[in-house]
């Protein structure tokens, strides 16, 4: 078992990296403002480290240097006329430029707004459109970006005549000698766009108090120890990457090692190499698909223990997407021989509208499941006793973090009893202030007494929260509810498929009835084999829903994803119905 009081052999870390240990007393985000948190962290020797595609150290960036750069940038912002409350849009590239500009905006009293990097799907025009929509939403006084994205960034900014500059151009500006404004806990600290919000973006306004209360609860729940070091490949434009793996380490004075998201996508095992080289205990989070990719990259000829040592991985966080028990078990099977312990898994539940974390599994408890009868999940009446019962494994997402409260409500807004499945509502000190300049959407999900409708479905059991799916994704057929992930997971059991290859949603049939539609990435070129595959999928789905579905085989990499890498069923449905997704032609 892991010895939490073990000493740290800093010799394992790359030469020049910021250290794991520090004489500065640890504080768990007990600050009034985010600027105060960086001021304190800068008094120590810890910091962040940026690594190349192979996981080798490219640049160490101590918190002290980050603060110096941020203060200089704050004076540049003021010199440009940026005032408290103005927005500063930033392309969230994993590197010192973004970090310094983000905190510089905070010191200047402005609201930094992280915007996404381009993805490998969608193309230039789609990315420019996405940036344009988010720039229109946040209405920034300034837009900063890496030089290599200048063409696309300027094209997006030109539509609104926004002052747009590359990092280097901004850093060359003179600094104002004006006094920096003082912040209060209830001032807005930043805007965070919720995952998937491209066509109708929702900028979540988060105050200093809300952020730091959530980080305190998160750190307390993780039982942070002195030897902890964060390893991350998560993008900074997503709440789990920004809040969990940048702002949280600053507020809790933890050293971090970063691998760029695009480098993880190309070489996912570099993530595990970095954990292996970590001289302390590792705290590292990933959505389910990150663990899945690593398991799949291990060949049958490769022995995990010959390359990796994962015995010091204390917190293997799971979040940002539905947690797949089969994927987590496959990861354990692949890496147990390298010292990985299943008890390190730490499922969680959260959303940008709650700053980050709503619930967290206590460290050491690992993944715990409950088998729930399909009929309970669908809200239907008991099945015919002669019909075989089907069950789904639902993952325990832990207990509410400090300061957070959860209620499960029924269709009439009544509070449901223990194990009653309904809509998940949360209230607490870190629930968002509002959606930026969107009172209607704010009122639709946030009540006057502070309860947030998360849009998720779940139930409580013995103080733990279990999430079963998104309410808006539910497929209703003949009055019976079906979860799209149940359909997708069933199809994935056929040979040749992986997570993210299938999107299930409802469409309206010729007679006005709802019908399940299933889009599937197809890697088979033979027409006869495609026809057989379609028929096999159709039978799988019919066995679950009782209805013959529409099955469409589409080219690989067709199905859209959100900025955080999750499958976007809503966008897939829109693209399919608009004709932008072109299925393969298959004879009936």
Please name every model-derived segment.
Residues 1-61, 65-80, 84, 98, ...:
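N-lobe entry segment of adenylate-forming
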Residues 46, 175-193, 199-200, 210, ...:
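Conserved pre-ATP/AMP-binding loop-to-beta segment of ANL
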Residues 49-103, 120-127, 180-182, 203-212:
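Conserved AMP-binding/adenylate-forming core of the ANL superfamily
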Residues 55, 120-124, 128-134, 139-186, ...:
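ANL superfamily adenylate-forming
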Residues 212-229, 239-282, 297-303:
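Conserved AMP-binding/adenylation subdomain of ANL enzymes
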Residues 276, 284, 295, 428, ...:
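AMP-binding/adenylate-forming catalytic core of the ANL superfamily
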Residues 314-316, 323-464, 472-474:
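Conserved AMP-binding/adenylate-forming
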Residues 501-506, 517-518, 538-588:
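Conserved C-terminal "lid"/linker of ANL adenylate-forming enzymes
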């Amino acid at each position: 078992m892991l010895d939490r009081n073990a000493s740290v052999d800093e010799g394992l870390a790359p030469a020049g990296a910021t250290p794991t240990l520090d004489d500065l007393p640890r504080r768990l985000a007990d600050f009034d403002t985010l600027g105060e948190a960086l001021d304190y962290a800068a008094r120590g020797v810890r910091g962040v480290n940026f690594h190349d595609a192979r996981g080798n150290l490219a640049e160490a960036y101590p918190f002290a240097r980050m603060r110096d750069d941020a203060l200089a940038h704050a004076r540049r912002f003021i010199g440009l006329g940026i005032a408290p409350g103005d927005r500063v849009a930033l392309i969230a590239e994993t590197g010192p430029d973004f970090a310094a500009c983000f905190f510089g905006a905070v010191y200047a009293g402005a609201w930094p707004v992280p915007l996404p990097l381009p993805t490998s799907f969608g193309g230039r025009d789609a990315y420019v459109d996405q940036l344009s929509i988010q720039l229109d939403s946040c209405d920034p006084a300034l837009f900063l970006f890496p030089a290599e994205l200048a063409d696309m960034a300027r094209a997006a900014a030109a539509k609104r005549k926004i002052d747009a500059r590359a990092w280097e151009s901004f850093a060359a500006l003179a600094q104002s000698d004006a006094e920096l404004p003082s912040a209060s806990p209830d001032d807005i600290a930043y805007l965070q766009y919720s995952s998937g919000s491209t066509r109708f973006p929702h900028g979540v306004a988060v105050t200093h108090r809300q952020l730091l209360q959530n980080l305190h609860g998160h750190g307390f729940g993780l039982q942070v120890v002195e030897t902890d070091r964060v390893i991350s490949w998560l993008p900074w434009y997503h709440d789990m990457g920004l809040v969990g793996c940048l702002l949280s380490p600053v507020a809790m004075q933890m050293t971090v090692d970063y691998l760029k998201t695009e480098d993880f996508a190309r070489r996912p095992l570099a993530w595990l190499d970095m954990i292996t080289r970590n001289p302390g205990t590792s705290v590292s989070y990933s959505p389910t698909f990150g663990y899945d990719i690593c398991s799949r990259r291990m060949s049958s000829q490769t022995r995990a223990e010959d390359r990796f040592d994962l015995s010091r991985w204390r917190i293997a966080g799971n979040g940002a997407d539905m947690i797949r028990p089969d994927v987590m078990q496959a990861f354990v099977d692949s890496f147990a021989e390298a010292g990985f312990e299943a008890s390190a898994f730490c499922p969680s539940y959260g959303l940008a509208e709650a700053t980050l974390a709503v619930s967290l599994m206590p460290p050491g408890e690992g993944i715990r499941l409950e088998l729930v009868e399909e009929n309970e999940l669908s809200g239907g009446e008991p099945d015919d006793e002669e019909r075989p019962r089907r069950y789904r494994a639902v993952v325990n997402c832990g207990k509410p973090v400090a300061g957070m409260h959860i209620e499960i409500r029924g269709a009439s807004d009544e509070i449901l009893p223990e194990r009653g499945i309904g809509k998940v509502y949360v209230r607490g000190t870190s629930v968002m202030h509002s959606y930026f300049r969107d009172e209607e959407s704010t009122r639709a999900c946030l009540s006057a007494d502070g309860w947030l409708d998360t849009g998720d479905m779940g139930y409580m059991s013995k103080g733990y929260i279990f999430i079963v799916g998104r309410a808006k994704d539910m497929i209703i057929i003949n009055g019976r509810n079906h979860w799209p992930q149940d359909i997708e997971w069933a199809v994935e059991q056929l040979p040749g498929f992986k997570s993210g290859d299938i999107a299930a949603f409802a469409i309206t049939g010729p007679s006005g009835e709802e019908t399940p539609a299933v889009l599937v990435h197809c890697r088979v070129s033979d027409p006869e084999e495609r026809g057989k595959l379609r028929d096999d999928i159709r039978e799988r789905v019919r066995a679950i829903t009782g209805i013959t579905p529409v099955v469409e085989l589409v080219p690989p990499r067709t199905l859209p994803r959100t900025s955080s890498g999750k499958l976007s069923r809503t966008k897939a449905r829109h693209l399919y119905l608009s004709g932008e997704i072109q299925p393969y032609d298959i004879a009936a």
